[in-house]
Regions:
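Pepsin/retropepsin-fold aspartyl endopeptidases
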Residues: 1-403
Length: 403
């Protein structure tokens, strides 16, 4: 096979979401065509998806330093620095991208050891205040009590505006961001000095400060909600959301790659995880019409087991119930859509039969990664399950006991 045909194959693999296969093909091409800086940048993005931050930075920085002028490559480099806690380097990249609201805030934090743990080798298990409509965790923010919704669909920790001011969060620049169902919300970037989960502390976190939408707050009429705890924290650990026991477990990374389970150990591979730009958490899901499609894991979307854009209905073999509507909630507020039902849906070892979902009119995530994101997995699918996000190994595990 000639190199032109091989390149076409690599790009087709990537467009279909075959990330591991395309990585191997692009690595071969890069070895054969070392002058192709776009190949270096693509390998950097693939490493970013795999959360291999050292490799991502090496590929992307080399391509840019050798003359590549592509805003996407610079954005991916900024993200890699940001996840790694090198906030000063991230600030420089975001400034070059014109994102001055974020860049200025990160520059002020540039000399700090971001996400520093007060007990680096400790594990923590924190019970939830409630499980439905979404899991809520009681924490302390700069010493002030707070209730945070657990949401794998959020990147940074989000705090309500007035609460953040009262808690002494240092506020910086602003940007417009997009949340659930494509809803826009204005965010202010800030510096949180300490987030405490029991005796377990995480220091110097970048956070986003927003006005909590009334639609989200209305789902918790008897409990004040002060913000959202997202993947920016979860990705530092082997994170378990135990919907059975109603608790969050954070375990430090180990070299074994073995995920501890409630009744012993599970040995063997799980389902792949990827982290796209803005810490967008992706995994593989099976439906009758499509095996191993890539989906957004958004545990903070309630009101349906899953959600799909209108454009994917045919490919996924789904039919809409025209006489029914569902209402969900996310970081951007209420999400409304028509009801759809799948024959079955499988996430790792969890299989649900006849799950209800929502058809979204707007799903910006669908083509934002360079490959099709088929839809999102929500809270209702995960209820009564044990979900482990093994970020050190970039694998997802569902308990064998899921029913």
């Amino acid at each position: 096979m000639d190199l032109k045909t091989t390149e076409q194959e690599a790009r087709t693999q990537f467009a279909k979401g075959k990330i591991r296969e395309s990585t191997r093909t692009f690595q071969y091409l890069s070895e054969q065509l070392p002058e192709r800086l776009d190949m270096q940048a693509q390998l950097g993005y693939l490493a970013l998806l795999a959360n291999d931050l050292d490799a991502a930075i090496n590929y992307l920085a080399e391509a840019i330093n050798r003359g590549l002028r592509a805003s996407k490559a610079l954005a991916h480099l900024a993200e890699a620095y940001y996840r790694q806690g090198r906030l000063g380097s991230a600030a420089y990249c975001y400034h070059r991208l014109g994102r001055d609201g974020l860049a200025g805030t990160l520059a002020v934090m540039g000399e700090l050891d971001a996400y520093r743990l007060t007990q680096p080798r400790a594990s923590v298990e924190v019970p939830w205040v409630m499980t439905d409509p979404l899991p809520v965790l009681a924490v302390r923010v700069n010493g002030r009590d707070a209730n945070l919704v657990l949401d794998t669909g959020a990147g940074d920790t989000l705090l309500a505006t007035q609460f953040a001011i009262d808690a002494g969060v240092q506020l910086g620049g602003q940007e417009q961001r997009t949340f659930a169902g494509g809803r826009p919300a204005r965010v202010t970037y800030g510096h949180l000095e300490e987030l405490s989960l029991g005796d377990f502390g995480i220091q110097d976190l970048p956070v986003q400060v927003i006005d909590i939408p009334p639609g989200l707050a209305a789902w918790f009429p008897d409990l004040p909600i002060h913000g959202i705890l997202g993947t920016g924290v979860f990705a530092r650990f082997r994170t378990t959301l135990d919907y059975r026991c109603g608790c969050l477990r954070l375990e430090p990374p180990t070299e074994t790659g073995v995920t501890l389970r409630q009744n012993g150990q599970r040995v063997g591979p799980g389902t792949p995880l990827w982290l796209a730009e803005n810490q967008l958490l992706l995994t593989c899901v099976d439906l009758p019409a499509l095996d191993k499609g890539i989906w957004f894991l958004d545990s903070g979307m309630t009101g349906g087991s899953f959600a799909v854009p209108e454009s994917r209905l045919g490919a996924l073999g789904l039919k809409v119930d025209e006489g029914a509507a569902l209402v969900g909630a996310g970081g951007g507020g209420t999400v409304r859509g028509r009801k759809v039902r799948a024959d079955w849906l499988r996430l790792d070892r969890l299989c649900r039969y006849q799950p209800d979902g929502v058809v979204l009119e707007d799903f910006p995530v669908e083509q934002s990664c360079g490959f099709a994101v088929q839809g999102l997995i929500g809270h209702d699918l995960l209820r009564d399950s044990i979900l482990t996000l093994d970020f050190p190994a970039m694998q997802l595990f569902m308990s064998e006991e899921n029913r």
